[in-house]
Every structure is written in C-alpha cells, then in structure tokens.
Amino acid sequence: MHRFECVCLKGFAMSNRLPVTVLSGFLGAGKSTLLNHVLRNRDNLRVAVIVNDMSEINIDASEVQRNVSLNRAEEKLVEMSNGCICCTLREDLLEEVARLAEEGRFDYLLIESTGISEPLPVAETFTFRDELGRSLSDMARLDTMVTVVDGLNFLRDYQAADSLASRGETLGEEDERSISDLLIEQVEFADVLLLSKIDLISQHEREELIAILRSLNARAQIVPMVMGQVPLARILDTGLFDFDQAAQAPGWLQELRGEHVPETEEYGIAAMTWQARRPLHPQRFYEFIHKNWENGRLLRSKGFFWLASKYQEAGSWSQAGGMMRHGLAGRWWRFVPREQWPQDVDNTNAILKHWTAETGDCRQELVFIGQNIDVEKLSTALDACLLTDQEMGLGHMGWLRLPDPFGPWHEEAAA
C-alpha cells in the first residue's frame, strides 16, 4: 500500500515562509538513517518531516514517539507534462505543506522522497498552482536539494544497465527507467551530495568516487558521512537552492558552455566536447554506437546529433553509466518557417547563437565525461562517422538513400 507519512516535531511559532529541504537517494542509500539522525539531533529546531514511502514506514516508532503526530493521506501518481510518471504528490503535498505552514509551529520542513523518484519534478511542484490558485511557493521556500549517494554501491548500480523493474521497483507499468537514469537525475539536480557508507570503502575508493561525482555535478557540495551523521547546517537552511543554477549544474552542460568540468589526473577523469558542421553517415554512426566500448569508462554523455538520412531532424543523445538512449529531439530551426519561430528576443537569440550561413543550426554537439578515456581516439572515431566530401556531394536527396539502420524516429527524445 502506498503511504504518505507526515512526522511533525512540535515547536514554536515562525514568521517567514517555511524553509524546505528535499531529500532524495536510491533505495538503500541511507536516507532513513539520515532522517533518524536528524530527528535525534535537531539542535532545538522545530522540524516537520514528510516521508513519502511506496511501501512500509521506514521510521522506527520508538525514535519519534515523543511529541510526534502522524497524519496519513493517500498517495497519488501524477503524470508530468514531459511524459515521465513521477510520484510528485502535487495535491497531497500542497495540502500537507499548507497545513504545516499555517500552524506556524515549525522552523523547518524536511521532505524525504521515495527512493525511485527524481528530485526535479519535486522542485517543480513548488511552482504548481491548484484550482484555488494556491502554490507551495506562497507558503514554503525550497531551500536545499539533498541527494544521498550510496558510497558502497553507486558505481556498480550506475554502470549496470538494469531497469528499475528488474529490481521490482517502479512507479507503474509505464515506468521504463533504468537505475542509471534515476541515479544521474538524483546526482545532477542536487545542491548537496551526501556520500554514505564511507566506512565500508577504502580511502582511495572514496576519493575516486568523489572525483566522479564532481565531474557529474561540479556545483554540488559533497559531504561524506557515516551512519547518517552529518551537521544539520550542511542540509538545513543553507540557502543553496536556485532553480536556474540547479538546471545548469550538470557537468555535461558546463562543458558544453566552455566551463570545463574539473579534471582529476589522479583518477583519469576528463571531459570533451565534440562538434562538427556536417551530417553523420547513419550506417557508420549506428555501428559506432552499437560496438563494444573499449575506451576507458564512459560516465556521462549527452547532446544533439545530425544524421544525413534525417537531415531535417535533430537527434537527441543521452548516456548515463551503462544505459544509452537516442531518439528524436525535434526539427532543426533551419527547416522551420521563420513565422513559426519564437517571437521573444531571448529565444530568437539563442537560436541564432548557433547559426551559420552554410548549415543554419544543424550540427553535431556531444559532450563526453569519462575516466581513462583516450580523447583523441574518441574524436577520431566520431570524425570517421561524418560524411566524406564525396558523400556531401550527393545532396539532400542522395542522403535520403543512404542505408539507415536507425529506422523511423518517434516523439520520444532521450532523457
């Protein structure tokens, strides 16, 4: 049975909007251990805790038996506009937060998401308004996005191509996410990464994992912890959250903007951006994607690509750990009538920023972050997938006749 638990620790009145920390992390990472630590060591803070659990209650009643009231509400699965099904609990969460804020008895609110939820939709919930015009942002302030990273199992889970369904954990029949998909979302959209179980790994393994996490999210603060013990000041009322900054935090985006991902020579972590202004041969690029990867450990790659056989369409590319996805991103603006372009200046300038007279906005733009990767070898392999001068001479109609093992694309861009 799905449950939505609210554990309220009694306190005094407060005047400002209720500051909120959202706690994410994969199943077994140590979220509940951290939560129990917070409940036992509140430093006189009056804290309200909302726990979203897909199964059983994770909090031992003996640890919250004093000054605690439990309030249950049915959980809802909400289909987001981007097609992802995520347990955002919009209506339920709005009701609970409104009640807690109106009581004025709490200094802080800590929301623990279920282990298979992504933090971004939860953050977006704070901008949602219900039919009465109410919004979480009217009564609460999203302060910190925290993700607990399993120091012992993260790399194993991240590199595996296992689906959540294979672990018996999904949000419904339509949930086709992989564990890698979930982990990268939780890491990239975080202000603070808490590294758990560091007592179970070596110093070298810990430092290597920290370097890898920093390459995936250079903005986040990384805090090692044992048995959930972390100073509350690192996760409560930090003032770290900024939606725009969080959306730009992923390492691949920073590399694409020229803000190089921190490189750690000791662990062989580096990043590269591959760009080109001629289309890819569909057969050669397909073979490149599907051959065994033998160039170090590819941690993360993302971007857009341009196939000759689908020259009007932009392809999307997203890889995290052992999972790779590609598909249709949309139509290149070059092939969209100008009257259908965005009318505002900012969006128009964003299009023209990548415009050339020869190809418009059509281009290859892929970012790779990896460990012990031969960058020159990778760049050479990608260059070999581009059309030759002779193939370029075939023109658009000739490109359409090139062998294309990708098959038809559908409206399902890579995540």
Segment roles from a protein language model:
Residues 6-8, 84-87, 362, 385:
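Generic recognition of cysteine residues
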Residues 60, 96, 122, 209, ...:
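Hydrophobic side chains in well-ordered alpha-helices
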Residues 56, 154, 160-365, 375, ...:
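C-terminal accessory "lid"/substrate-recognition subdomains
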